[in-house]
Amino acid sequence: MGEKLQFTELDQYLFGQGTHYDIYKKLGAHPTMRGRKKGVYFAVWAPNARSVSVVGDFNEWDIQKNPMQKTGPIGVYETFIPEAKIGDLYKFYIIGYHGEEIYKADPYGNEAELRPGTASRITDISSHKWKDTTWMKHRPEFNEKKSPMAIYEVHPGSWKKHEAKDEDDPGFYNYRELAHELAAYVKKMGYTHVELMGIAEHPFDGSWGYQVTGYYAPTSRYGTAEDFKYMIDYLHRNKIGVILDWVPAHFPKDAHGLANFDGTAVYEHEDPRQGEHPDWGTKIYNYGRPEVKNFLIANALFWIEECHVDGLRVDAVASMLYLDYGKKDGEWVANKYGDNKNLEAIEFFKHLNTVVLGRNHGTVMIAEESTAWPKVTGKAEDGGLGFSLKWNMGWMNDFLEYMKLDPYFRKDNHNKMTFSMTYAYSENYVLVISHDEVVHLKCSMLNKMPGYPDDKFRNLKAAYAFMLFHPGKKLLFMGQEFGQLREWSEERELDWYLLKEEKHQDLQNFVKTLLHMYTKYPALYAADNDPEGFEWINADDSYRSIFSLIRKSPTKRNNLLFVVNYTPVDRPDYRVGVPKKKQYKLIMDENGLLDKPKIFKAEEQECDHREYSFNYSLPGYGVAVFTY
């Protein structure tokens, strides 16, 4: 073809080994120069294709005009097209292994046509001029084990919406608008991070972004790749970290996507018992194939290094770890040892986390893992998977079951609130109340609470207070901070009008107070992984459904004593055991921060197996926070 090839022998070797971590800078579509000619370099991996060409706006989608050249045995095709330019739509036209004609979007494309269109769009992903220098300079210093993490989980398409211009207008905010409104709200509330759902390009709104076709493309629903980078940049300049949902567990069968990419199983396993999720109707990646592993690991690095994202929340980890996940007998293939562990996925996680965290100090890899798989956050070299943090699904299930109970029955389920402390230090945990808990007839957080409307609000405040004082980082899905009544739907914005009502505003202010307290007091975060940082005062007062505990600061200053009542019964003379004979300052109760702290002096009266104690008038559903 005459032009200088960009995919070198070294590229071939590294890609074949699964260690070409910058592969996205070679594969895909890249505006560049050939001598004095401006144009676009295209490269795609299609190992079993008979031929590949590029079709697009620049050649009137003519399959004959721009054939690609196969560069070597690994199966990468490439070409340079002077007529192609930024903004043009394109696809790869493939004659498959069996002679079939296939049109595919670019697996490494950085922008996509707005759905229902399925083409890729040429862009210059490196054109953004970053202004988050201060954030990035200090990012390597971040230590998630000793730092506060209060994460606001957000679905960008439904957090807020514009009024629709017509029936086809979804009213989405642009990434830039989101940046400004989100930053202002998150800062005001006291969150430290946002976790964004559905950023990678996906064809179906109702999948919430969990069936991805464009792993390297921020979804065009909210603007361009440049707009997306602006949002990250702006959030960083406002001292807000950004975590993305990331889905390496499976991919959809859409014709333009990764499935049967060149007429054969390229990204997935060929055997449907290994390559299909029957429950989800999706394909499973072949984690043992170096080029596939490379595609995914480089994708994680793309978001973190190219887009400055601060961490990834890895979806559906359990589905990757178990070969029989969601499958009946005969629908799966055992590993070489005859059991159900996916050895290739285990090695993939170790490789992924070692590379991502090794190259990017101060970032986090978070596992959504719903089983008791050991050492999810253990070091890879010690046999762990190497994640930074793991969602604490066990705590969440027990906590929500308890909170949904009528207060009369809580005394018989007291252990649901205490059991999590028996394993709290087995992993590095995030306590989560995610989008999954407020959909599919599960009710919003407010409507999970028992009783009349007033009781629901009081219960929810007590619930959030307990969550804040339990060891672990925090995640709360959008809308639950102000008492969203309806379940979440991706089709409509949150019910912000509820904030015109005093009770919703009061709940929002209470959550805001909790979050600002969380970031102010190291006792609440600096010893999350140290058993010395937590002490039950009374974990056994099941009859009255009252819990009392202490969170300790590593400096031994500004420790916090927390008491909560999960019945509507007032306890005017509730005696609390304390560790020392000193003054305890009440700084917050169920109504929020006190204008002036109240002093309680410990007396030499035994209570809760402690030498000292004091009396406190604890209201029904009351919360009390003391510092000492």
Q: Residues of each region from the PLM?
A:
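Short glycine-biased active-site loop of nucleotidyltransferases that positions the nucleotide triphosphate
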Residues: 69, 204-209, 253-260, 377, ...
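Short catalytic/ligand-binding loop motif for oxyanion handling, primarily in non-cytosolic enzymes
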Residues: 101-102, 160-162, 202-205, 250-253, ...
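Carbohydrate-interacting/catalytic domains
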Residues: 1-148, 176-186, 190, 454-457, ...
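Conserved alpha/beta catalytic core and glycan-binding cleft of carbohydrate-active enzymes
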Residues: 308-310, 328-490, 519-529, 533-576, ...
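Soluble or luminal CAZymes and related metallo-dependent hydrolases
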Residues: 174-178, 227, 291-296, 341-348, ...
